[in-house]
Amino acid sequence: MVTLSMSTRDYGLMLHMKKTVGRLNADVEISYPKFVDILVAVRNMVRECPYDICEMPFTTYICAREYGKKFTALPVFITRNFHHGAIFASKAAGVEKPKDLEGKTVGVVRGYTVTTGVWARGVLAEEYGVDLSKLRWTPTDDEHVAEFKQLPNVDYKFIGRDIGDLFRSGEICGAVGTVMGEIKSLGPLIPDAVEAGFAFYRKTGIYPINHGIVVRDELLERYPTLAVELFKALKESKDFYLANLDRAGALSAEDTLTVRLEEGLGGDPFPYGVEANRGGLEALTRYAFDQNITSRKYAVEELFPPETLDLVG
């Protein structure tokens, strides 16, 4: 019997598994070490692999594949978001619409390769015609994948700086990510961003993937049924969460969002499996290539264990 460590946040989708699944099969038990900060957990997983199974932002995972990291994702996506509301700009700097960002310096909360930034840049390029090569990007942190090579239009001189301070000082005119605090003349660049996200879904069928779950390759090779059994346990946990959500009661912020998504998307907002997510995966792998995070566009099938490609969740 082997005990595998699994590190994720306590999302509603995950709680049933964490409370009920100790023994996965005759050979494998799952332990859930006390969760550290998500940024710390992901950075450690990419650089040192201290966990056997770990939550990971999906473009961090794609970038990690580019540099030969020894773990593989399951087709399970435990966080998602629309990113129209993650694009901010300063009207004082003359930014009234997305195209106005061209020629400007735009901050990125955390690293250039973070999934929110990748989706936000995709929105700017594909929905609003912004030429991303004309923007200069300034992350506030380094990359999870330390080997990632600096791009000509990405400048890391603001690492450790606060995005709000950079706006106030006039050193940046826009930003992608979560911008905290009240900043005069600063606001979301896309009007009614929530509705814009749902409109994006109606047009594309995509509810953007943020975080998935990866498993160390050595374990997938040693235990041939592990990927499928983990998928089934994760699906059961998600199904339990959705089936037992007290939609008529007092809801947490997470649960309230889930109910709104069920209504807005017309069903399960968190489908697992490759085919149910092919549109989003194709878009994200294309964006990763277009934004020079990877040297080629990865085929969706390359990203998951072969035995999981036909699973439905």
Regions found by a protein language model. Give the residues of each.
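Extracytoplasmic "Venus flytrap"
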Residues: 3-15
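Secondary-structure end/capping motifs
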Residues: 220-290
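Long, low-complexity C-terminal extensions of enzymes
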Residues: 275-313
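Immediate post-signal peptide segment of exported/extracytoplasmic ligand-binding proteins
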Residues: 1-5, 95-105, 290, 295-297
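Hydrophobic/proline-rich hinge and linker segments of small-molecule sensing/allosteric domains
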Residues: 6, 80-96, 208-221
